[in-house]
């Protein structure tokens, strides 16, 4: 049976997590194995800045357990530079690399710019250009995009509206696909910092459980408050709250 609530972090290769999460003396080539013994999913975040090669994606596929899932953040060239315009060539390049993950490729995240007002026509054309054999999530950083017209477009194309917590800004809870996607960037107004309290984690877990009740087949939760290793520590905590142990994470 597929895991209903999958918990992980945005990236795993952080030297400053040695001590708080990884063993202090862990080598760089040991980090992914350590991570996958505790979580069943990870969000590849560095692909936003630099797209890894297909060979690299394939190596990650081969180094992880059979049930492991990679979410991949799409290139900023698509979302920030081109602003979703004429995406065909950029999407082709992206998938020629990311498809190296094979069956372990999970949702693709498109994070839109924070100061770009709603453009429904651009979104409509972009959604129509997406290959149909993948799952997609959209993190809409400008609140102007929180509009019924956009939600309807996402629903029409079975794309998830990312529920996020970012520097005091939160997006609406709305299920627009058969899965849900949650990104937690930190509980404070300082980006990527701070540790969520147990009470705050329970609130976010309730969001995930609500998505399940609303019909979501799976909910992906990724922590991005990477300073001092808080992302990994919070991910472990909420995973335990959800009723999963480290040893169960990759047995589904």
Language model region names:
Residues 1-252:
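Residues lining hydrophobic/aromatic ligand-binding pockets adjacent to catalytic sites
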